[in-house]
Amino acid sequence: MLNITLPDCSVRQYESPVTVAQIAASIGAGLAKAAVAGKVNGKLVDACDPIVEDSAVQIITPKDQEGIEIIRHSCAHLVGHAVKQLYPNAKMVIGPVIEEGFYYDIATEKPFTPEDVAAIEARMKELIAQDYDVVKIMTPRAEAIKIFQERGEEYKLRLIDDMPEVEAMGIYHHQEYVDMCRGPHVPNTRFLKNFKLTKLAGAYWRGDSNNEMLQRIYGTAWATKDELKDYIQRIEEAEKRDHRKLGKQLDLFHLQDEAPGMVFWHPKGWALWQTIEQHMRKELNAAGYKEVKTPQIMDKTFWEKSGHWDNYKDNMFVTSSEKREYAVKPMNCPGHVQIFNNGLRSYRDLPMRLAEFGSCHRNEPSGALHGLMRVRGFVQDDAHIFCTEDQIVSEARAFNELLVRIYKQFGFHDVSVRLSLRPEKRAGSDDVWDKAEQGLREALTACGVEWGELPGEGAFYGPKIEYHVKDALGRSWQCGTLQLDFVLPERLDAEYVTENNDRARPVMLHRAILGSLERFIGILIENHAGSFPLWLAPVQMVIMNITENQADYCREVAAKLQAAGFRAELDLRNEKIGYKIRDNSQYRFPYQIVIGDKEKQENKVAVRRKAEDLGSLDLDDFIAQLQQEITDALVNH
């Protein structure tokens, strides 16, 4: 007899072997119908997999996150089933789960159209309505190869070649369609009803631009119809907020093919940039940072010594001059070590906090570029803290407090923390990494924050704390980082004189709050839907006259507002006021000021905040109100 322990600690006995589906059926008909898969001793398995020894078992249903991911993975297989019925010559590649969805890469003779995707979705719905069972068969490797050879699935054969030698692999049968996978998958298509194909894109085989282009069909799937509806509404809202669309509408920036991954900032966009940079500079100065500037291009030997050449060369732009090879800096950290090394440093100089709005370039694949979110040329609000081991915790706490306050100023109140641990490709010994990872854990504990850990996600030179902000649509964006580095000071021979007159290596803390300014501005645009808070708006108000008679007074009002430090624009066009209000509304200025004869005579301004009419105000009172609004945002949050 088998002893099966359930999550409530109850134990049930079964004849050996028993499947997850059979266990669910023995508990109740409702659970049997809802069972998507199972978890046996912590490992996900198909509902049909046999259990042959005493085990702890959990029934996975669509209510579980694992259940949702299994549904999404099975929907990807269903895409394959529909595509092969409609386009028999298509070659299936891979179909993984991604955040809130899935995709399938497909090799086709000609690109799919939106109409093709609609036809694929319709066929998927027809297949779901057939309510067929998905059958898993563990198949010998040689037989699996034969199956895909007979079907002409060359990409599946390439994938099998890359796999470790195994006796058998899971082949999932969707009626006449077969696909290979580690699984698990749903036992029946009835679980796949709440899905939607969302977009079509191109993707290179293995993500390499030297390889052939494939067609990628994206989709999403959920446990219930309401969850799917909510997701679609969120996607539609996200499309309205797309920073690329709003960047053009608000006249902030543009990108063009002649400079891939590089941004052309327009006057309004550059005003937004400068507002952010100047605000950050003020905050950093108050926190004891010293601003520096380091070269854009440095000799190859410098990057070899820092370790970047061995670990990051493929992402660096390289040039040569006068028989010397140079690299454009992808990071600011090695340059900051040179400033630290320029002179004899004492323990009394520590902590030394060096900040730079550093312009960096990384050779990102062209297919990965995406508006402001993924660029090749960018500026980081970068800083490096050189300190002793005893100062790590206090510096981490101070940084955490600074970061949280700044995020609140920008409108982000929901911040989550993750600790990224050593990657496979790294510099430094395991002892050094043990020390660095434990140092960050102690720092996070001292900050009183909860965190999750991400094995393998650290930088090559050290572990890092990642700060993720949640935007108005509930999306999470990684912005801030704090990285602990014992490696670079050693490689670049950084040292200081200790209290005992010995020489010691400083600890180096790499930290950023916004990350890439370009990307952070993209996040801000989408979070605020282009309707920025007053202190941040590139144009804070527009002043409009009703007739030419008020033009001079409009200029006086603009001059007074500008003298008070506000970014005010004039609209004195010979147009009806209703038209000017509507036209300026598209730019989402925080305030619109309308001036007619009455306002001119009474030395007042008629104020509209977004769509709200605030009435006629004394100009000095209005300025005081604006100043208080900014104080509330930046000081009182």
UniProtKB/Swiss-Prot annotation:
The keyword Zinc applies. GO terms for biological process: threonyl-tRNA aminoacylation. It is found in: Cytoplasm. Keywords: Aminoacyl-tRNA synthetase, ATP-binding, Cytoplasm, Ligase, Metal-binding, Nucleotide-binding, Protein biosynthesis, RNA-binding, tRNA-binding, Zinc. Its main location: cytoplasm. Its cofactor is Zn(2+). It holds the Pfam family HGTP_anticodon. The keyword tRNA-binding applies. GO terms for cellular component: cytosol. Catalyzes the attachment of threonine to tRNA(Thr) in a two-step reaction: L-threonine is first activated by ATP to form Thr-AMP and then transferred to the acceptor end of tRNA(Thr). Also edits incorrectly charged L-seryl-tRNA(Thr). Homodimer. Belongs to the class-II aminoacyl-tRNA synthetase family. This is Threonine--tRNA ligase. It comes from Neisseria gonorrhoeae (strain ATCC 700825 / FA 1090). The lineage of its organism: Bacteria, Pseudomonadati, Pseudomonadota, Betaproteobacteria, Neisseriales.
